[in-house]
A protein has these predicted regions:
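Bacterial N-terminal signal peptides that target proteins for export
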Residues: 1-9
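Bacterial N-terminal signal peptides
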Residues: 10-17
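Electrostatic cytochrome c docking/interface patches
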Residues: 20-37, 53
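The canonical Cys-X-X-Cys-His
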Residues: 39-49, 102
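Short cysteine/histidine-rich zinc-coordinating motifs and their immediately flanking basic loops
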Residues: 53-60
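Short Fe-S-cluster ligation motifs
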Residues: 70-94
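C-terminal capping alpha-helices of c-type cytochrome domains
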Residues: 87-120
Length: 120
């Protein structure tokens, strides 16, 4: 088999594995949902020029995001009132399920990952 055919076959096999693998598809869907939730709940207070500081997933490394969500999130946000979501504290405006998706998105796309992201 010549080199072009080998490369074409390898690319086709890889593409079919990605398309037919439900785990990869679910991961992509979860990342998209995490990004949407980050934009919806976090960005309006943590965007460029914000007095709260600009934060995107690639602002911190994975260990810093883990430490933030494990130790600092509740303390830093429980008294912050979120006018966008009915004037309740941020910790009440974001459900535990949504927070977990935001956490996963932030950690999976931190500065020290293969796919660092902003929220564009």
């Amino acid at each position: 088999m010549n080199r072009v055919h080998t490369i074409t076959l390898a690319a086709a096999l890889l593409a079919s594995a990605v398309v037919t693998n439900p785990v990869l598809a679910e991961t992509a869907a979860e990342a998209e949902e995490g990004q949407r939730l980050f934009r919806e709940h976090c960005r309006h207070c943590h965007d460029k020029g914000s007095p709260n500081g600009k934060y995107t997933p690639m602002t911190l490394i994975q260990a810093q995001w883990e430490r933030f969500f494990d130790r600092k999130y509740e303390r830093k946000h429980r008294k912050v009132i979120d006018e966008k979501f009915g004037g309740v504290p941020v910790t009440e405006a974001i459900s535990p399920e949504a927070l977990e998706k935001i956490r996963t998105f932030s950690i999976d796309h931190a500065a020290d990952t293969d796919q660092p992201m902003t929220c564009g």
